């Protein structure tokens, strides 16, 4: 860090003592940011954006971004707010990143994209919040309840060798047997890509409610959100990355993990 001669250091590591120690060592301000459990939809994320706006004298831009996120959320919720509980499909979020890449057993019962999109999470009885692995037996037991599965792209490289050993590993999942398996972009490993978390919420909604989101094009959503966050449309560039596997899609269950893709 010293070789970069920074004027300020922005940290996402929420340890005040370590931040203070680094600040003393470097002799420049060290600012720590937090987002909270609801990721891009959390008020603490908004507070962090506002803080950055103040630091860099871009408060107007910060408020514009916060307003954009709120409008995107409202746009999703407006399409799903009237859906009765019994009409919500049960979806399994598969392979969430958690301090690195994981496999199909890493999930979350409080996955915020499902809550915002008004999607029923097939996992509901874990003992703690946040991303965590479930037992293989539990995954099997949940299989018949899965109307759809959404795989996080970060987990694909770890699932492929498991699938090579046992190509029947998903056969207990009704969603897999019926071809209702989908791929979202990786958004979290050690830290979070907040723009992707927002785009993934649109994809969760479109996956669960295709009729209500028929007019939503994921490339257009990706370009719109990356422009708001990063200043330019990036769908083509992101989808072209090897570990994006072509971007948002319904996957071919016969070939995707068998080595003919990715």
Question: Where are the regions that the model predicts?
Answer:
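A residue-level marker of the well-folded mature domains of exported/periplasmic proteins
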Residues: 111-118, 134-144, 204
């Amino acid at each position: 860090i010293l070789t970069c001669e920074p004027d300020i250091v922005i940290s996402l590591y929420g340890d005040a003592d370590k931040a203070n120690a680094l600040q003393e060592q470097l002799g420049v301000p060290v600012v720590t940011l937090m987002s909270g459990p609801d990721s891009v939809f959390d008020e603490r994320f908004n507070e962090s954006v506002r803080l950055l706006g103040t630091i860099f004298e871009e408060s107007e831009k910060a408020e514009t971004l916060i307003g954009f996120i709120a409008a995107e959320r409202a746009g999703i919720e407006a399409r799903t707010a009237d859906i009765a509980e019994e009409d919500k499909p049960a979806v399994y979020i598969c392979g969430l990143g958690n301090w690195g890449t994981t496999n199909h057993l890493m999930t979350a019962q409080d996955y915020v994209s499902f809550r915002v999109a008004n999607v029923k999470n097939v996992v509901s009885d874990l003992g703690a919040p946040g991303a965590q692995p479930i037992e293989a037996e539990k995954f099997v037991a949940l299989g018949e309840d899965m109307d759809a599965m959404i795989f996080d792209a970060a987990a694909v490289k770890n699932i492929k060798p498991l699938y090579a050993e046992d190509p029947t590993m998903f056969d207990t999942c009704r969603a897999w047997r019926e071809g209702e398996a989908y791929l979202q972009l990786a958004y979290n490993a050690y830290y979070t890509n907040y723009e992707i978390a927002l785009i993934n919420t649109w994809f969760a909604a479109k996956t669960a409610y295709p009729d209500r989101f028929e007019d939503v094009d994921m490339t257009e959503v990706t370009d719109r959100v990356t422009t708001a966050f990063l200043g330019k449309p990036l769908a083509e560039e992101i989808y072209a990355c090897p570990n994006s596997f072509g971007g948002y899609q319904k996957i071919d269950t016969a070939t995707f993990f068998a080595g003919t893709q990715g």
